[in-house]
Structure formats: C-alpha cells, structure tokens
Amino acid sequence: METIAFRMVLNPGMREEYERRHAQIWPELVDALHNAGVRDYRIFFDPDSNHLFAILTRNSHHTMDELPQLDVMRKWWDYMADIMHTGPDHTPVQQPLEPVFHLNSLS
C-alpha cells in the first residue's frame, strides 16, 4: 500500500456545491477508482485558501495512470470543471504534496 497527497483549488464559494456533487458520486466512478487500486480517498477543505487537500491510499499494483483514459473519469472532470481550477482539458490542477511526518501508532 502507498499513500499519496495532493492539493487542488476550489473556486470561491463552491464548497457546498463540491460537497453536494461528491455526496452523489457516480457508482461507476467509485467502481473505476476501486478497480484502479484506490483503497481510501479523503479530501479536506481549507476555507481560508479554498485549497482542497487530498489523501489517497492505493495498492502497490495500482493502475491509476489509466484513469484519464476512462470515459467516466473524463465526464467527472468535465462535470467538476466549473467549480475548481482545471487545465484546458478539464483535468484538475493538482500539486503533489511531500510527506514530512508520519505517526502509524502509539506505543
């Protein structure tokens, strides 16, 4: 298993809409993420900066690099493009984050 983190940027005033859309995430998108090896995916919001912080755990044999070729992934990105920073192809602008601390368990 591997954990990665990245930052995205939400457009101002779009938190509720972002949460609403994710509360109704398409089952076929959930299936695609699971099939690609995603085991846990959490997104946090910083209201002061409109930054979204994503933490994703995936298996070591993940196929996440293939997700952009899936119709459901492209459609989701198109659906989300009006409320967050994206590239010209509607891919979310993501800034990878580097780990600086990890506490697995208390002894």
Swiss-Prot record:
It is found in: Cytoplasm. InterPro entries: Dimeric_a/b-barrel, L-rhamnose_mutarotase, Rham/fucose_mutarotase. Pathway: Carbohydrate metabolism; L-rhamnose metabolism. Keywords: Carbohydrate metabolism, Cytoplasm, Isomerase, Rhamnose metabolism. Its main location: cytoplasm. GO terms for molecular function: L-rhamnose mutarotase activity. The active site is at residue 22. Its EC number is 5.1.3.32. The keyword Isomerase applies. Substrate binds at residues 18, 41, 76-77. It catalyses: alpha-L-rhamnose = beta-L-rhamnose. It comes from the Bacteria. GO terms for cellular component: cytoplasm. It holds the Pfam family rhaM. One of its GO terms (biological process) is rhamnose catabolic process. Belongs to the rhamnose mutarotase family. Involved in the anomeric conversion of L-rhamnose. NCBIfam families: YiiL_rotase (TIGR02625). PANTHER family: L-RHAMNOSE MUTAROTASE (PTHR34389:SF2). Homodimer. This is L-rhamnose mutarotase. It comes from Paraburkholderia phytofirmans (strain DSM 17436 / LMG 22146 / PsJN).
